[in-house]
A protein has these predicted regions:
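Compositionally biased low-complexity segments at domain edges in trafficked proteins
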Residues: 76-91, 203-232
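Surface-exposed, short loops/turns at beta-strand junctions within beta-sandwich domains
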Residues: 166-176
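Flexible, surface-exposed loop/linker segments and immediately adjacent secondary-structure boundaries
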Residues: 12-31, 37, 51-129
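Low-complexity, Pro/Ser/Thr- and charge-rich linker/hinge segments at domain boundaries
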Residues: 67-68, 103, 113, 194-220
Length: 232
């Protein structure tokens, strides 16, 4: 089975997910030549990302790393939005999430937003332009952000799902912060990884997320790239 999405930029295929007997041969983060052939065994599932979107390959069989099938061009604009700008300037994933910033499914609407309810590695490109997000904005709350140089607070009004990360809590690569607020079951821990993608295309972004260990962000990027998939 192969799934392909259309985009506008050409990029070499990148393995972004891998499971099964051949996972060591084709690990996540492995870049492939356009003319590469993948020989998969029964139980193998490989997800490839390139400038056209994602392809899912399921073994057994031999597959080309590239494909000629082209799907809806609307996906290309979604992918372009993901790689342009940072923080609040990044467009939301319109094809995947609600444009309001409040998603009824409780999932973060943009991979570059810090979900205050989840402990994770958080890859960012611009430490001075970071956005925090909460899935439940029904009540006003005060977010306490504790880090290596003390604590600061961030007030969120009722109905406010997003806010800029406070300048008082300076971010550098490797810095860790504990987030807490009234009603939280437990504090969450966020470790920031400053990434400088070698390229600004989707594969460059995905490679940076893989190297930074930012799995949840990678999952959202893959989901955005797979949102309008066609089968072929």
């Amino acid at each position: 089975m192969a799934v392909l999405l259309a985009g506008t930029a050409a990029a070499a295929p990148l393995v972004v997910r891998s499971s099964g007997p051949s996972a060591k041969t084709y690990p996540a983060g492995k870049a492939l030549a356009d003319n590469a052939k993948l020989t998969l065994k029964a139980g193998d599932t490989i997800v490839l990302l390139d400038g056209k979107g994602t392809r899912t390959l399921s073994g057994p069989g031999t597959f080309s790393a590239s494909a000629s099938t082209v799907a809806a061009a609307s996906t290309g604009s979604t992918l372009n939005a993901l790689v342009s700008g940072g923080g609040e300037k990044r467009a939301r994933i319109g094809a995947v999430r609600s444009a309001s910033g409040i998603d009824k499914g409780g999932k973060v609407p943009n991979p570059w937003y810090v979900d205050v309810t989840r402990s994770s590695n958080m890859c960012i490109a611009d430490p001075a332009n970071v956005t925090v997000w909460r899935p439940d904005a029904s009540k006003a709350t005060t977010l306490t952000i504790a880090g290596p140089n003390g604590s600061t607070t961030l007030d969120l009004a009722a109905g406010q799902a997003m806010a800029s990360w406070p300048a008082a809590a300076a971010i550098s690569s490797g810095s860790q912060y504990k987030l807490s607020w009234d009603g939280a079951k437990a504090p969450t821990n966020v470790k920031f990884i400053v990434v400088r993608p070698a390229t600004t295309d989707m594969t460059g972004i995905a490679q940076s997320l893989i190297e930074g260990g930012c799995k949840e962000q990678l999952d959202l990027v893959i989901e955005a790239a797979s949102g309008n998939a066609s089968h072929g």
